UniProtKB/Swiss-Prot annotation:
<keyword id="KW-0813">Transport</keyword>
<dbReference type="Pfam" id="PF02271">
    <property type="entry name" value="UCR_14kD"/>
</dbReference>
<dbReference type="GO" id="GO:0006122">
    <property type="term" value="P:mitochondrial electron transport, ubiquinol to cytochrome c"/>
</dbReference>
<dbReference type="GO" id="GO:0005743">
    <property type="term" value="C:mitochondrial inner membrane"/>
</dbReference>
<comment type="subunit">
    <text>Component of the ubiquinol-cytochrome c oxidoreductase (cytochrome b-c1 complex, complex III, CIII), a multisubunit enzyme composed of 3 respiratory subunits cytochrome b, cytochrome c1 and Rieske protein, 2 core protein subunits, and additional low-molecular weight protein subunits. The complex exists as an obligatory dimer and forms supercomplexes (SCs) in the inner mitochondrial membrane with cytochrome c oxidase (complex IV, CIV).</text>
</comment>
<dbReference type="InterPro" id="IPR003197">
    <property type="entry name" value="QCR7"/>
</dbReference>
<keyword id="KW-0249">Electron transport</keyword>
<keyword id="KW-0999">Mitochondrion inner membrane</keyword>
<protein>
    <recommendedName>
        <fullName>Cytochrome b-c1 complex subunit 7</fullName>
    </recommendedName>
</protein>
<keyword id="KW-0472">Membrane</keyword>
<dbReference type="GO" id="GO:0045275">
    <property type="term" value="C:respiratory chain complex III"/>
</dbReference>
<comment type="function">
    <text>Component of the ubiquinol-cytochrome c oxidoreductase, a multisubunit transmembrane complex that is part of the mitochondrial electron transport chain which drives oxidative phosphorylation.</text>
</comment>
<keyword id="KW-0679">Respiratory chain</keyword>
<dbReference type="InterPro" id="IPR036544">
    <property type="entry name" value="QCR7_sf"/>
</dbReference>
<keyword id="KW-0496">Mitochondrion</keyword>
<comment type="similarity">
    <text>Belongs to the UQCRB/QCR7 family.</text>
</comment>
Length: 130
């Protein structure tokens, strides 16, 4: 589990570096796109609302308990805000630096496991068929 946590920390650092290295034009467009998105105004991150499939569901299942509790809190708060048709104050919005793709290491690991499983499922031993 420590390797996945270190991978998440590494993704977080590379994400911050990637944001810092954007050109002015790219930064302006990405900032506009991010700030007009509704999910950050109610305190969510992109991976909280990303489209679900089997791989993403498994990645959510493998999250550490603290991260799952944080995500559950963000979703509950966002549901309440959405039901009340309100948004958070500007200071509480999710910032781009905080919107870290925290599921990426888990998704990559699961996809690699599925590829390995498919390889072994389709494996034909040379001893079986001479």
């Amino acid at each position: 589990m420590t390797t996945l946590r270190s991978a998440v920390a590494k993704v977080s650092e590379t994400w911050k570096m990637k944001i810092a290295q954007r050109s002015f034009f790219e930064k302006t467009i990405k900032d506009f796109n991010f700030n007009t998105g509704y999910y950050n105004q109610i305190g969510l991150r992109w991976h909280d609302i990303m489209p679900r499939n089997a791989v993403v569901e498994e990645a959510f299942r493998r999250l550490p308990r603290e991260e799952r509790e944080d995500m559950d809190f963000r979703l509950a708060r966002a549901t309440l805000l959405s039901a009340n048709k309100t948004i958070l104050s500007k200071e509480e919005w999710t910032k781009q630096e905080e919107d870290v793709p925290y599921l990426d290491p888990y998704i990559k690991l699961i996809e690699r496991e599925l590829r390995n499983k498919a390889d072994w499922d389709n494996f034909i031993s040379p001893r079986t068929y001479p």
